[in-house]
Regions:
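A short, polar/charged loop-to-alpha-helix boundary motif
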Residues: 200-212
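Mid-to-C-terminal Rossmann-like scaffold of FAD/NAD(P)H-dependent oxidoreductases
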Residues: 109-203
């Protein structure tokens, strides 16, 4: 028996459209997962049989094993002490350089154009930009782009490229065949992101290239 405590109103609410989230939720529930939405763990204590988790809704759950999948937050404490410019993360330019000469940042802690991208693809491009700049070559420069994300959910294949700034647009269902869905995120009629599930994930790379 598995209880999954979810802070939002649906799974991966920050990057995934509700339509695909709901299909994934159905698949997980069919597998015996109990989903608890709009709830957040505030306290965890050891018990004789494992752990007791208490939520902000006043609920308590007993568990033998606890797995935290709550994301990451850049640790900028050291950078602040060193007078490096920070915001959400450590601020970098197109060469991955900070405001201090010869001090660089890449990876989960780096912020470019107000965005922290804690994914493998942008980190790989940051490494190329940093290496290029170090060797005096300016051909490789880091640019914040939408990233392609593959979720590791065996019950439902999902690939998506969420918009960088999801504030003025909306998710629209583009195609629906059985359990497979394709949604586009549009802003003033222009596609700036997509989400695919089921059989449609095979077209992810093609759509991603078109998006860029």
């Amino acid at each position: 028996e598995v209880d999954m405590i979810v802070r939002g109103s649906h799974l991966m609410s920050q990057i995934m459209p509700e339509a695909i989230s709901h299909n994934l939720e159905t698949k997980l529930q069919e597998s015996g997962v109990n989903l608890i939405f709009n709830s957040e763990v505030k306290e965890m204590n050891k018990s004789e049989n494992g752990y007791v988790l208490k939520t902000d809704q006043g609920e308590a759950y007993n568990a033998q094993l606890v797995l935290a999948a709550i994301g990451i937050l850049p640790n900028i404490a050291l950078a602040k002490k060193a007078k490096v410019e920070t915001n959400i993360g450590i601020c970098i330019d197109e060469n991955c350089q900070t405001n201090i000469e010869d001090v660089y940042a890449i990876g989960d802690c780096a912020e470019a154009d107000g965005v922290v991208q804690a994914y493998l693809e942008p980190i790989r491009r940051q490494v190329k930009a940093l290496a290029s700049h170090t060797y005096g070559d300016s051909t490789e420069r880091f640019k914040v782009l939408p990233t392609l994300i593959k979720t590791k959910t065996p019950s439902l294949s999902i690939m998506l490229s969420p918009p960088l700034h999801a504030t003025h647009g909306q998710w629209e269902l583009n195609m629906n065949v059985g359990e497979s869905q394709r949604l586009h995120y549009t802003v003033d009629g222009e596609v700036s992101g997509f989400a695919l599930s089921g059989e449609f994930v095979t077209s992810a790379n093609k759509l991603y290239k078109e998006l860029l």
